[in-house]
Amino acid sequence: MTRYKAIISYDGTLFSGFQRQSQARTVQEEIEKTLQKLTGGQGIQIHGAGRTDAGVHAYGQVIHFDLEQKRDPEKLRFALDTQTPDDIDVISLEIAADDFHARYHKHFKTYEFLVDIGRPKNPMMRHYATHYPYPLDIAKMQAAIKDLVGTHDFTGFTAAGTSVKNKVRTITAATLTQDPKTGFLVFTFSGNGFLYKQVRNMVGTLLKIGNGRLPIEQIRLVLESKNRQLAGPTAAGNGLYLKEIIYEE
């Protein structure tokens, strides 16, 4: 068996998420169906570094899979890229070490979240940025976002009912900028792992701080109390992008 590692991007608008689900269109299912065609009917399972939700996009998702026959990586990449649906792009593909695992090999992820603060909103970007038409103090949010950096228990920022027991994660960078061309707000978070809906809950809280409905100290309060009820609402998934995954050597 030969293990392959690929970097893929996708428009999440018409997907019910990355992970295979019954009676729902997913990124995993589409790639596995294409691999099955390319291998003459073999059942191939792919493994992703992250399980993005419905409507969430990716610039740099990483997957791995095993094939019985060794294939030329570029020819395989081209075949996958041209035979998967148009909302999936196979950026690169290479032979990986036998013990490489896209999800469990130690890595750092970067997520980006776009917020359209225009009044009126940009209808062409409705699937690619979350609209927030209310007044915002950007400087306030830029000050508050710094409290997320470091190693914390992020229980207060994860969705209820998550099965993950250890909710301690490290965020190495958290920034908020404004795109000079579009005027969109760009939230960027990098870290060693993120809990279910963590990024969307952090953005929802920051927007509420910027709107003056939560104090600037609320991020610290949520982290210290581990109370989801003190955080803001979950921001919509359409503004979220899995931007990059970097593996340790």
Curated annotation (Swiss-Prot):
Residues at the catalytic site: D53 (nucleophile)
Annotated binding of substrate, by residue: Y111
Reaction it catalyzes: uridine(38/39/40) in tRNA = pseudouridine(38/39/40) in tRNA
UniProt-listed Enzyme Commission number(s): 5.4.99.12
Keywords: Isomerase, tRNA processing
CDD domains given in the database record: PseudoU_synth_EcTruA
Top-tier EC class: isomerase
GO biological process, one term: tRNA pseudouridine synthesis
GO MF assignments: RNA binding; tRNA pseudouridine(38-40) synthase activity
Family: Belongs to the tRNA pseudouridine synthase TruA family.
Assembly behavior: Homodimer.
Job of this protein: Formation of pseudouridine at positions 38, 39 and 40 in the anticodon stem and loop of transfer RNAs.
Identification of the protein by name: tRNA pseudouridine synthase A
Gene: truA
